[in-house]
Amino acid sequence: MSVFEIVFSPTGGTEKVSCLVAGALDKNTVTVDLTDSGLDFHEVSMTKDDVAVISVPAYAGRVPAVVVDRLNMVHGNGARAVLVCVYGNRAFEDTLVELEDVAKRAGFRVVAAVSAIAEHSVARQFAAGRPDAQDAAQLAEFAQQIQQKLLAEDASEPSIPGNRPYKQAGSHRMAPEATEDCVFCGACAAACPVCAIEKGDPKRTAGEACISCMRCIAVCPRGARKLDPNKLSAVSQMLSKVCVVRKECELFI
């Protein structure tokens, strides 16, 4: 049995959670990076004896569309799947049920699901420092329960919260822009999951292609990519009404 860690983590928060879950199941995992636009996902294939921890962020309560497209290329071949949804302390809404449907279409058997919290990718002040020690302890406990289910060869499906049809996907995108501090190193263009930044001129961003994942901000070595401060302020004000109270990780098994 191999444990695959299939993860989409533009700013690193989802990866932290994913590692806590997958690493507790097996210290030697096979990583599939869904942010890698150069990877041929048709070549990703598992067997029925394998386990896949599929970890994605919630974008306005949905699975990012690019994740759906790339998971549709993967061959689950009956492998058992543990679904992980990570959100910035607002809500994950229909993300897990959508991920369940996508995983099943790709040939996985869903045996467990986890929702967890990480620092908000846009307004970083919300859920700052998470996953923290309390989250890590809780996720380790979840992983132990999942491991017991796997060892018992219990393939029963969990009851996962969410709605079908899913909520409408968010349409308001915010594309970060390069500031005067940009030195044209190209790190942002190389890392963009959807190739929305021109490699020859990283100050040019295709707004219609950008998915507002904030990866370019996260990888810029000079902090030279920023969101429009007025738009960021508006988002922060909106989130302040729903992100103040700490939300906890949940296990669905």
Feature names for model-found ranges:
Residues 91-92, 181, 209:
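Charged, low-complexity surface patches
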